[in-house]
Protein backbone atom coordinates (compact mmCIF):
# COMPACT_ATOMS: atom_id res chain seq x y z
CA UNK A 1 0.00 0.00 0.00
CA UNK A 2 1.54 3.33 -1.05
CA UNK A 3 1.30 6.44 1.07
CA UNK A 4 -0.40 9.37 -0.69
CA UNK A 5 1.98 12.30 -1.22
CA UNK A 6 1.02 15.43 0.74
CA UNK A 7 0.51 18.37 -1.63
CA UNK A 8 2.13 21.64 -0.56
CA UNK A 9 1.91 25.06 -2.17
CA UNK A 10 3.64 28.30 -1.20
CA UNK A 11 2.41 31.80 -1.88
CA UNK A 12 5.40 34.13 -1.86
CA UNK A 13 4.61 37.84 -1.56
CA UNK A 14 7.31 40.50 -1.44
CA UNK A 15 6.74 43.00 1.37
CA UNK A 16 5.99 46.60 0.22
CA UNK A 17 7.97 45.67 -2.88
CA UNK A 18 8.31 48.91 -4.86
CA UNK A 19 8.74 51.08 -1.76
CA UNK A 20 11.23 48.65 -0.22
CA UNK A 21 13.33 48.67 -3.40
CA UNK A 22 13.34 52.47 -3.42
CA UNK A 23 14.43 52.55 0.22
CA UNK A 24 17.15 49.98 -0.45
CA UNK A 25 18.44 51.78 -3.55
CA UNK A 26 18.21 55.22 -1.92
CA UNK A 27 19.34 54.93 1.73
CA UNK A 28 18.20 58.50 2.43
CA UNK A 29 14.60 57.22 2.08
CA UNK A 30 14.96 54.54 4.77
CA UNK A 31 12.65 55.10 7.71
CA UNK A 32 10.75 57.81 5.82
CA UNK A 33 7.14 57.85 4.57
CA UNK A 34 7.54 56.92 0.89
CA UNK A 35 4.89 56.83 -1.83
CA UNK A 36 5.78 55.19 -5.12
CA UNK A 37 3.53 56.51 -7.84
CA UNK A 38 3.04 59.08 -10.51
CA UNK A 39 0.65 60.63 -12.93
CA UNK A 40 0.40 64.03 -11.30
CA UNK A 41 -2.53 65.05 -9.10
CA UNK A 42 -4.77 62.41 -10.67
CA UNK A 43 -2.23 59.63 -10.14
CA UNK A 44 -2.53 56.75 -7.70
CA UNK A 45 -0.26 55.22 -5.09
CA UNK A 46 1.47 52.19 -6.61
CA UNK A 47 3.14 51.29 -3.32
CA UNK A 48 3.32 52.68 0.20
CA UNK A 49 6.21 52.17 2.59
CA UNK A 50 5.43 50.76 6.01
CA UNK A 51 6.30 54.16 7.50
CA UNK A 52 3.50 55.89 5.58
CA UNK A 53 0.89 53.19 6.13
CA UNK A 54 0.42 54.33 9.73
CA UNK A 55 -1.03 57.56 8.28
CA UNK A 56 -3.70 55.53 6.48
CA UNK A 57 -2.01 55.62 3.07
CA UNK A 58 -2.30 52.46 0.96
CA UNK A 59 -1.88 51.21 -2.59
CA UNK A 60 -4.45 52.32 -5.19
CA UNK A 61 -5.29 55.47 -3.19
CA UNK A 62 -5.27 58.76 -5.13
CA UNK A 63 -1.94 60.51 -4.57
CA UNK A 64 -3.73 63.76 -3.72
CA UNK A 65 -5.57 62.01 -0.88
CA UNK A 66 -2.35 60.33 0.31
CA UNK A 67 -0.59 63.70 0.46
CA UNK A 68 -3.48 65.13 2.50
CA UNK A 69 -3.05 62.29 5.01
CA UNK A 70 0.74 62.71 5.09
CA UNK A 71 1.87 66.09 3.72
CA UNK A 72 5.55 65.29 4.42
CA UNK A 73 5.45 62.12 2.31
CA UNK A 74 8.20 61.59 -0.23
CA UNK A 75 6.83 60.83 -3.69
CA UNK A 76 9.10 58.80 -5.96
CA UNK A 77 8.35 57.75 -9.54
CA UNK A 78 7.69 54.16 -10.54
CA UNK A 79 10.76 52.39 -11.98
CA UNK A 80 9.16 49.31 -13.48
CA UNK A 81 12.36 48.07 -15.15
CA UNK A 82 14.11 48.02 -11.76
CA UNK A 83 11.24 46.18 -10.07
CA UNK A 84 11.18 43.62 -12.89
CA UNK A 85 14.93 43.09 -12.46
CA UNK A 86 14.58 42.38 -8.74
CA UNK A 87 11.54 40.21 -9.43
CA UNK A 88 13.61 38.03 -11.78
CA UNK A 89 16.17 37.58 -9.01
CA UNK A 90 13.45 36.44 -6.60
CA UNK A 91 11.94 34.06 -9.17
CA UNK A 92 15.42 32.59 -9.75
CA UNK A 93 15.63 31.80 -6.03
CA UNK A 94 12.23 30.10 -6.12
CA UNK A 95 13.15 28.09 -9.20
CA UNK A 96 16.27 26.86 -7.44
CA UNK A 97 13.85 25.00 -5.14
CA UNK A 98 11.23 23.91 -7.66
CA UNK A 99 10.69 24.12 -11.41
CA UNK A 100 6.98 24.51 -10.67
CA UNK A 101 6.81 28.26 -10.04
CA UNK A 102 4.00 30.44 -11.31
CA UNK A 103 4.57 34.18 -11.28
CA UNK A 104 1.33 35.92 -10.29
CA UNK A 105 2.65 39.48 -10.54
CA UNK A 106 5.92 41.38 -10.28
CA UNK A 107 5.93 40.84 -6.49
CA UNK A 108 4.04 37.55 -6.03
CA UNK A 109 4.52 33.94 -7.05
CA UNK A 110 3.24 30.47 -6.29
CA UNK A 111 5.57 27.52 -5.78
CA UNK A 112 4.46 23.90 -5.86
CA UNK A 113 6.45 22.34 -3.02
CA UNK A 114 4.85 18.90 -3.32
CA UNK A 115 7.47 16.21 -2.78
CA UNK A 116 10.25 18.66 -1.96
CA UNK A 117 10.40 17.61 1.69
CA UNK A 118 12.68 14.76 0.62
CA UNK A 119 15.20 17.33 -0.63
CA UNK A 120 14.74 20.28 1.72
CA UNK A 121 13.09 18.93 4.86
CA UNK A 122 9.75 20.15 6.27
CA UNK A 123 8.04 22.80 4.13
CA UNK A 124 8.06 25.24 7.05
CA UNK A 125 11.86 25.01 7.16
CA UNK A 126 12.01 25.36 3.39
CA UNK A 127 9.89 28.53 3.58
CA UNK A 128 12.22 30.00 6.21
CA UNK A 129 15.21 29.12 4.03
CA UNK A 130 13.62 30.80 1.00
CA UNK A 131 12.91 33.93 3.05
CA UNK A 132 16.55 34.09 4.18
CA UNK A 133 17.86 33.53 0.66
CA UNK A 134 15.55 36.15 -0.87
CA UNK A 135 16.70 38.66 1.75
CA UNK A 136 20.33 37.83 1.04
CA UNK A 137 20.21 38.01 -2.77
CA UNK A 138 18.10 41.19 -2.85
CA UNK A 139 20.19 43.11 -0.36
CA UNK A 140 17.68 43.06 2.46
CA UNK A 141 14.20 42.84 0.92
CA UNK A 142 11.76 40.66 2.80
CA UNK A 143 8.90 38.43 1.75
CA UNK A 144 5.98 36.71 3.39
CA UNK A 145 5.23 33.08 2.59
CA UNK A 146 1.91 31.33 3.09
CA UNK A 147 1.65 27.53 3.06
CA UNK A 148 -1.32 25.44 2.02
Where are these regions (language model features)?
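Gly/Gly-Pro- and Ser/Thr-rich, intrinsically disordered tail segments characteristic of DNA damage-repair
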Residues: 1-148
